[in-house]
Amino acid sequence: MSNVDHAEIAKFEALAHRWWDRESEFKPLHDINPLRVNWIDERVSLAGKKVLDVGCGGGILSEAMAQRGATVTGIDMGEAPLAVAQLHQLESGVDVEYRQITAEALAEEMPEQFDVVTCLEMLEHVPDPSSVIRACYRMVKPGGQVFFSTINRNPKAYLLAIIGAEYILKMLPRGTHDFKKFIRPSELGAWSRVAGLEVKDIIGLTYNPLTKHYKLSNDVDVNYMIQTLREE
């Protein structure tokens, strides 16, 4: 059975035409993208690397990594977001290869092909996150690195990521996230280690509603990223 939640895909299909509108529902993704790309680039030096972006959506992260000199492939199961990504790269002149395929299917086709794999804000939208993590392990070269980001599962995350972001501040459409699908760092770390990935670093992303700014911090209570390594 395919590791795809069609209801989740439908959510993003409906919003795809606004993906590159920085004042739309995707504003948070645009705002945090420079922080995330810098954090990744500092750890792997993207220039000259072959990179896979799993769950690329409309291509915000994929384009940014390509602009840093990486050769980027972006994959997603949403047809409309991928169409938006392909159109936008015609405007921006950034070269990214986009494909509609699951991580598991691409892992069968392209094992150990990528220096870096990113899988950001995607794991909380699939039925079996551990399956995606195993696929990422298979696709990264020995000695390569895999980056994941998701949302912690605790009362604070429910309050800020769902009640705050979706209902009070209206930064995201209601129903964007399902609290039951949020992932604790301990769970993500355990799944990564079982897959064969060593957790190297973790960082939190926090939002100040007064200044409307995000920053990287040691607070991993809500949004967080991890860096993992496939040993040689």
Swiss-Prot record:
State the source organism's domain of life: Bacteria
- This entry's Enzyme Commission designation comes to 2.1.1.222, 2.1.1.64
Q: Which pathway does it serve?
A: Cofactor biosynthesis; ubiquinone biosynthesis
Q: Which reaction does it catalyse?
A: a 3-demethylubiquinol + S-adenosyl-L-methionine = a ubiquinol + S-adenosyl-L-homocysteine + H(+); a 3-(all-trans-polyprenyl)benzene-1,2-diol + S-adenosyl-L-methionine = a 2-methoxy-6-(all-trans-polyprenyl)phenol + S-adenosyl-L-homocysteine + H(+)
What are the entry keywords? Methyltransferase, S-adenosyl-L-methionine, Transferase, Ubiquinone biosynthesis
What biological-process GO terms show up in the record? methylation
Q: Which residues bind S-adenosyl-L-methionine?
A: R36, G55, D76, L120
Which InterPro entries would you find in this protein's record? Answer: SAM-dependent_MTases_sf (IPR029063), UbiG_MeTrfase (IPR010233)
Which molecular function terms from Gene Ontology are attached? 2-polyprenyl-6-hydroxyphenol methylase activity; 3-demethylubiquinol 3-O-methyltransferase activity; polyprenyldihydroxybenzoate methyltransferase activity
Q: Record's Pfam families? A: Methyltransf_23 (PF13489)
- Family statement: Belongs to the methyltransferase superfamily. UbiG/COQ3 family.
| Described function | O-methyltransferase that catalyzes the 2 O-methylation steps in the ubiquinone biosynthetic pathway.
Protein's UniProt name: Ubiquinone biosynthesis O-methyltransferase
Species whose genome carries this gene: Pseudomonas entomophila (strain L48)
The taxonomy runs: Bacteria, Pseudomonadati, Pseudomonadota, Gammaproteobacteria, Pseudomonadales
Gene that produces this protein: ubiG
